[in-house]
Amino acid sequence: MKPYFPMFVNLEDKRILVVGAGTIATRRIKALMKFGASIRVVAPLFEHELERMEGLDLINRGFTPGDLEDVDIAVIATNNAPLNEEIARMCEVRGIIKNVSSDQTLCDFFFPATIMTDDIIVGICSGGNDPSVTKKARSDIEEYLKEKRR
């Protein structure tokens, strides 16, 4: 696996495109929204949960290459792996960093498991190799932080 630099990014002025609106896309959107991201979602169908979320720009249709105009970050999470790969290649040409749900080798970044308190944010990532290790580490760190606050 390539080494990934753990980096915390201010998303308030970033334009984020999410292609797809299923379970994985919804989970990614929820994570991004916690950090003030401006998110446009392109998909032919939307989960009801997404339709109820405020602050999203929902575009009800399939992806077109023009959707990548003025995008800083792309989250590609359709249920069509060849389409995901095609969009990822378009992002590479345009210099858009991307996360691709169907192929971690195409990802420029991963979504870490996060722990947020009033004064600390912790991100944990196994690079997609072993989610159970990430889950255990998150649980252990959460417990540690709870004990420190007592």
Model regions and ranges:
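Alpha-helix C-terminal capping/helix-to-coil transition sites in glycosyltransferase folds
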Residues: 13, 69-71
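ADP-ribose/adenylate-binding Rossmann-like module
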Residues: 73-77, 84-109
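Glycine-rich, charge-decorated loop segments at or immediately adjacent to ligand/cofactor-binding or catalytic sites
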Residues: 107-117
